[in-house]
Amino acid sequence: MGACNITVLLLVIMLWLPHGLSMGNSCSASVLEARRFFELENEQLRRRFHEEFLSGYNYNTNVTEANRQAMIEVYARNAELNKRLAQQIKSSDYVQSEDADIRRQAEHLSKLGASALNADDYLALQNAISSMQTNYATATVCSYTNRSDCSLTLEPHIQERLSHSRDPAELAWYWREWHDKSGTPMRQNFAEYVRLTRKASQLNGHRSYADYWVQFYEDPDFERQLDATFKQLLPFYRQLHGYVRFRLRQHYGPDVMPAEGNIPISLLGNMWGQSWNELLDLFTPYPEKPFVDVKAEMEKQGYTVQKLFELGDQFFQSLGMRALPPSFWNLSVLTRPDDRHVVCHASAWDFYQDSDVRIKMCTEVDSHYFYVVHHELGHIQYYLQYEQQPAVYRGAPNPGFHEAVGDVIALSVMSAKHLKAIGLIENGRLDEKSRINQLFKQALSKIVFLPFGYAVDKYRYAVFRNELDESQWNCGFWQMRSEFGGVEPPVFRTEKDFDPPAKYHIDADVEYLRYFAAHIFQFQFHKALCRKAGQYAPNNSRLTLDNCDIFGSKAAGRSLSQFLSKGNSRHWKEVLEEFTGETEMDPAALLEYFEPLYQWLKQENSRLGVPLGWGPTDKIPSDCCGTFST
């Protein structure tokens, strides 16, 4: 799940979020003077962003202490300039301007974020964050079969074993090794990060860093909407969770997987349990209807990493959207280098100059990376579409929008109709059993992710708001993972352990509810684009959301381009309404997409007598803390 220029998001988020330009009709001298002021300041801001992202990219693609220090120096220097700009705006009357665009720019440029800290505190914060990132990027673990070989990295070595091993002891070994190496040593850095972000938030007039993050959604009710949305989706997740637990018990036996309770994360094929589709062979509803092995077909046809990106580029061009510029191909890092450490977590980068956009990821040729490539190219297309906006508006009006754009393209790309069109499968229309299999496969990532995405920031909100004592930081994390998602660590964890930093986004200070929101918005976007493309009609069995492919639709492309080009210049509800006809985050489209599978799960679980739900985990001390139910 790549984020936009994730590594330097802490600095950028304080200035970067709301975007757009609606100049109004006023021509008063004060308005003209303000417009000139913001025109000049946006150019300076653009140059600072270029410098920041360049230093961040250099560090991410060559993780050395020298590059880390160089990046921090750039951040610190520009933080002082950002602080001066914010103070200048606050001392003016721009926030009360008669011109709506001036007010919007003034409001967002006066949000300082971490730059509000004094120079020493700012450097300490950046050191804490970058130290966590460095540890994550360089952590290695010992092999289960050869304990003297301690050179295994998360990608590809550990993930390959989590995906393919069916030995519970081996899976638990790699889970514990990774968390012990990438998480526990970072507790002091995380505590420093919490202390300093709390201080920065108070200097910005917020009670906590959680409230600072929430305000970027420009809706005082948005947190409540997230809670309500999660509750709407929980019945579907409970059916899926119960079915998977039942099938795991069939495979591993009752000693490894009891009939009820939480599922050990190590059995789910992903380090964090945020996606379970690597274990599809254990869960497939109709195994006599085998899935097409897209990876095998890619290998047969000689696919390369370059080919994956070319296909993504062609998809956007087929919509009449922008082609990738030559600099993308020359300057991106698309595979893992052999001669240096890199942060392999996929991310897309906007350098705020001359359409310079890049991707950094350790790509391999398989169906997972086929999806990730399109996701990251969605970020890239967003950058290209709004690059004409002033720097303050070069971003998404809702943090969830940026993450949703790549995913909405991937929904078309991974459809049977599209896979047939590009020659990876022979049949572009699935029979009912194959359709259930396909929806099930998608649910193992799209639906399974929701409790994880929800818990990551519910946990950090509790930490930031001091609702969770520092003596309970680790057990509180696992209590939330259990309570919201019914998963648990494979081994007992105490406060001597510290597992949250074993996830990249926590190390990198990336607000995470954007991914939860994106998983809802992408289906709203998908439905709107499928209508534009003539690929969807309600109650039409031949034009369903789950087999819609907008490839080649100029009408869909125009609609998407108009939506993206506004950047953050206007409130997200306004641009969402123009794009989809809706004004709120609404899971109805997601539930419609998966409705056939939901009905199948309810019937199958009832037939099999599958128990649903779970109780508290027993893998943490029993006196940890109270429940967190929303």
Curated annotation (Swiss-Prot):
Ligand binding (Zn(2+)): 375, 379, 403
Phylogenetic classification of the source organism: Eukaryota, Metazoa, Ecdysozoa, Arthropoda, Hexapoda
Known regulation of activity: Inhibited by captopril, lisinopril, trandolaprilat, fosinoprilat and enalaprilat.
Name used for this protein in its record: Angiotensin-converting enzyme-related protein
Catalytic-site annotation from UniProt: 376, 505
PTM characteristics: Glycosylated.
GO biological process terms on file: heart development; heart morphogenesis; positive regulation of circadian sleep/wake cycle, sleep; proteolysis; regulation of heart rate
Gene3D superfamilies xref list: 1.10.1370.30
Enzyme Commission (EC) number: 3.4.15.1
Cofactor, how bound (note): Binds 1 zinc ion per subunit.
Keyword Protein transport: no
Subcellular localization: Secreted, Extracellular space
GO molecular function: carboxypeptidase activity; metalloendopeptidase activity; metallopeptidase activity; peptidyl-dipeptidase activity; zinc ion binding
pH dependence: Optimum pH is 8.6.
GO cellular component: extracellular region; extracellular space; plasma membrane
Signal sequence range: 1-22
Coiled coil, from the record: none
Major enzyme class: hydrolase
Keywords (A to Z) from UniProt: Carboxypeptidase, Disulfide bond, Glycoprotein, Hydrolase, Metal-binding, Metalloprotease, Protease, Secreted, Signal, Zinc
